Amino acid sequence: MHLVIGAGEFLGNHVSAALAVQAPVIELNADADDETLGDAIKSVEVVHTCAETWSPAHRLRFRRDPPRLLNRVVQAARRAGVRRIVHVSTADVYGPDHIAKITERSKLRPTHAYERLKLFEESWLLESTQDLEVVVLRPARIFGPGENWMLPHLMRSMARGRVWLPGGGRVMQTFIAAEDVGRACLAAADRGKPGKAYLVGGFDATWRELLESSARAAGVGAEIISLPYDLAYLRALTAEAAAAAGAPVWPGVFAVDTIGKPHQVDDSHSRRELTWSPSVGSFEQLMPQMAAWLSELPGVEGRREPEAISPPNRSLS
């Protein structure tokens, strides 16, 4: 039996659905009270923590407070005799300044508050659970229906006719479908080594390619314009300076670095050790599942027929 913490959220929903294909699953919201958490965790062997503890869409400040949700989960897991915790973190803990592909041996150089907070969560969890098996997953850039940070903002701009991207969105990234993160969770639950962190990826592509595919699926025609990275960063820095701590900001400097700097991972180690592989190898493969969601995003007015815009081999601009 598997318990997923983060039900009702983007990643939690996809992880639950992927796990349910292979094993019985209990879903729990991140804000469930202690009594509900205690009741749910009694009968499970593995707990998957994939709730959004920090939102990259907000102006964050780094602090060393023990992660409240993880602390509650750990205490409940101890009382219930849970065998293993699979914690979904992020490849962003390595920081934004790696030119070569990241491996598990790459240096951890987090810069942004979000990156540092996520790494602190990992460290706290591993140091505080010597009596429990903990496996950490570090997914590359996650995409899929329900994603609530990048695509809603970018698609709203697309619907208005143009979107400005650092470097034109042509910098190579590693993406992974949210459902494949769920499959990696199952592999980590069965075969991950306690105390280890694994990178998990899907395929290499660009933000520009994701937006072009999304625009076709949603029936939106738009121009993608290249903005110099330095100018995009300066604009984001100005926006953040005007925002209160914890307030939403778009685009923030983290978003600019997410689009404008390379973030590629080499997950060959996890594929060998966990004996898993992703099922989604391109944006186009997932677009039939994403089309309705994309076309219903706030500010997006378009048709759902991909043929209405342009064939897949034609650039939007």
Where on the chain are the PLM-derived regions?
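Amphipathic terminal alpha-helices
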Residues: D267-E273, S277-S317
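Glycine/proline-rich active-site loop of Rossmann-fold NAD(P)-dependent oxidoreductases
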Residues: L119, F143-H153, A187-Y198, V220-A222
